Amino acid sequence: MKNEKMKNKESGGSVLITGASGFIGSFLVEEAVRRGFDTWAGVRATSSRAYLQDPRIHFLELDFGKPDVLRRQLTGHGRFDYIVHCAGVIKCIDPADFERMNHRQTCDFIDALRELDLVPRQFIFISTLSVFGPVHERTYEPICDSDTPCPDTAYGRSKLKTEQYLQRLEGFPYVIFRPTGVYGPRERDYYLMAQSIRRHVDVAAGFRRQDLTSVYVADVVQAVFLAIGKGVARRAYFLSDGQVYSSRTFSDLLIREMGNPWVIRLKLPLFALKIVSLCAEWWAKRRKKASTLNRDKYHIMKQRNWRCDTGPAVRELGYAPAYDLDRGVRLTVAWYKENGWL
């Protein structure tokens, strides 16, 4: 064991990945282990470890909701070389939970690291393109860092506030990634689209042109480790696969890979989508569940321009996305089938 730890230390140092049981987090853990990092999966006591079975993974339980407990948990381990913060929520029963869990708890985490003298070499924060909201909706220009954020979702606002907090901390070694829609094996929101296609129904929203972007989960992981390798700090990067797609491209690829002979295509006007979204959210709240279709999802589907400028990531990190949508959907559907999801 001592030799193994020394090997890991020499290979890359120690890395803590919060939200490790989640979609992006579990792939980051796998890649960290593969690269020889001393890999720590930050999880809740109740988190599933289904995708964290490698015996080389160490676990650290973190209670972000209790700052005093969190400080004891962090002190018990000591400083990590790198922290990749994936923990957070993408849908909630109460929209106020976005503020509490994505913003305030992340700020408490950062404050604890600073107060305990546990600041890592890099603190990598997984944010979202949604922090900018609907920008260049008429011109369809790529969203870039010089644009003014105007998020119209509770999720986007919570992530933006955390970005702004990081940027105010003098000398804090943050790196921010703002991926567009991330898809791949283990992801459940895009999986709902596959389920709909399996039922021979494809639903789109709005009648005006919509430019969509996507990024396969492995390319997000690639970007994170490129940032670690380059040692960059106090930078923010957009991530996509570099391509722009129409609103039908994803569903067309699903139809092809799933071998569906026919599909009914429905295009809802935005006002109808809004009504359906609010009703779905209301019904889910009555059942004390978080609905995938909600007012945040309505604003996401309403947005027409999802182009973003990945140039800085390409130039500064050497980011080179390896998966376009064609390849990514093929691998994703294959995984769904192999794992009994389809």
For each feature predicted by the language model, list its residue ranges.
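NAD(P)H-binding glycine-rich loop region in Rossmannoid oxidoreductase-like domains
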Residues: 58-104, 108, 134
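Conserved Rossmann-fold NAD(P)-dependent oxidoreductase catalytic core, especially the SDR/UDP-sugar
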Residues: 107-154
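Mid/C-terminal beta-alpha module of Rossmann-like enzyme folds, strongest
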Residues: 227-292, 310, 326, 330-331
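Amphipathic terminal alpha-helices
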Residues: 308-316, 320-342
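N-terminal Rossmann NAD(P)H-binding glycine-rich loop of SDR-like oxidoreductase domains
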Residues: 15-35
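Catalytic helix-loop patch of NAD(P)-dependent Rossmann-fold dehydrogenases
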Residues: 136-181, 202-206
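Substrate-positioning beta->alpha
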Residues: 157, 161, 187-192, 205-228, ...
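Flexible, glycine-rich beta-alpha linker
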Residues: 132, 175-192
